[in-house]
């Protein structure tokens, strides 16, 4: 079972190809859980949602076959996302749910624990407490740890104090390119090996960096795996990294090696971005078919100074 911590959000999304009439369910932990279950695994999402969205949230998760441990709060979280033709986006806060305060007992039985916050809802003390209560593989998507609300309700990014020590608590840390640069000070599009080396030097056993149309990198035990993205039309890239994480964690739960896991994760993400919303179509058969088409290069990275 995969246990995912992170608040759901109800987003308004506008891209060059799609514009949602109503706010749609999303969120890092939610999207990862959906992908994990659609691939054939068992998942439970831990988060907080406002009374206004509670019934819809529970119905959606039940329909998808996902368990939940939900705390209610004053309002549900959500963003307004505007994408340009290059895939760049602006985030405006529509609502912010409260921080998660409860750790379900099932954390002790989980095979994988995923921390996927959207906006500061997994306090550092909560993460440390989770680590002491589980022997599961722990995976971090740091996106919500690096966001705060700035002027006019716009999201701004920052590097929090103590993030290096926190990341070292995890077995796998998966930032995207923006988050990688915030964490390391290195643009991974310009020097990918150096950016990964900085994160490795923090004591992270496996570093996964996603790079949108440039694919992804996995570095583990001194081995470097570079995955090309599959060609597709990105109708809505919201949740691409989330579902990449879901596919990766499912692959690991099945005992796949890093090469095979990265191929499957790449395939899962390629299916998500062709669609919009939590009802995205994803089957294990199609994901496996696409995974077989992923181009991978493998080598040991050259010695790279991390400073």
What kind of region is each of these model predictions?
Residues 6-8, 243:
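Active-site metal-binding loops of divalent metal-dependent hydrolases
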């Amino acid at each position: 079972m995969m246990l995912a911590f992170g608040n759901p959000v109800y987003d308004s999304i506008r891209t060059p190809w799609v514009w949602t009439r109503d706010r749609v369910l999303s969120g890092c932990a939610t999207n990862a859980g959906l992908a994990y279950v659609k691939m054939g695994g068992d998942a439970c999402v831990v988060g907080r949602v406002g009374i206004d969205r509670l019934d819809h949230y529970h119905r959606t998760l039940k329909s998808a076959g996902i368990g939940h441990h939900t705390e209610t709060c004053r309002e549900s979280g959500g963003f307004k996302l505007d994408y340009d033709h290059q895939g760049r986006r602006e985030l405006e806060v529509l609502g912010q749910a409260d921080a998660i305060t409860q750790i379900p007992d099932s954390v002790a039985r989980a095979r994988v624990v995923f921390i996927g916050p959207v906006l500061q809802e997994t306090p550092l003390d909560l993460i440390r407490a989770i680590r002491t209560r589980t022997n599961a593989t722990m995976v971090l998507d740091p996106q919500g740890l690096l966001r705060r609300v700035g002027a006019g309700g716009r999201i701004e990014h920052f590097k929090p104090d103590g993030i290096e020590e926190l990341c070292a608590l995890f077995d796998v840390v998966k930032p995207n390119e923006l988050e990688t640069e915030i964490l390391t000070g290195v643009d991974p599009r310009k020097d990918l090996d150096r950016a990964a080396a900085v994160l490795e030097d923090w004591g992270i056993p496996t570093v996964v960096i996603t790079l949108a149309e440039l694919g992804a990198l996995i570095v583990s035990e001194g081995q470097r795996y570079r995955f090309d993205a599959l060609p597709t039309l990105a109708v809505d890239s919201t949740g691409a990294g989330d579902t990449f994480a879901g596919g990766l964690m499912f692959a690991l739960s099945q005992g796949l090696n890093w090469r095979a896991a990265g191929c499957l994760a790449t395939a899962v993400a390629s299916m998500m971005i062709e669609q919009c919303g939590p009802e995205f179509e994803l089957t294990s058969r199609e994901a496996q078919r696409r995974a077989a088409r992923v181009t991978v290069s493998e080598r040991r990275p050259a010695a790279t100074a991390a400073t």
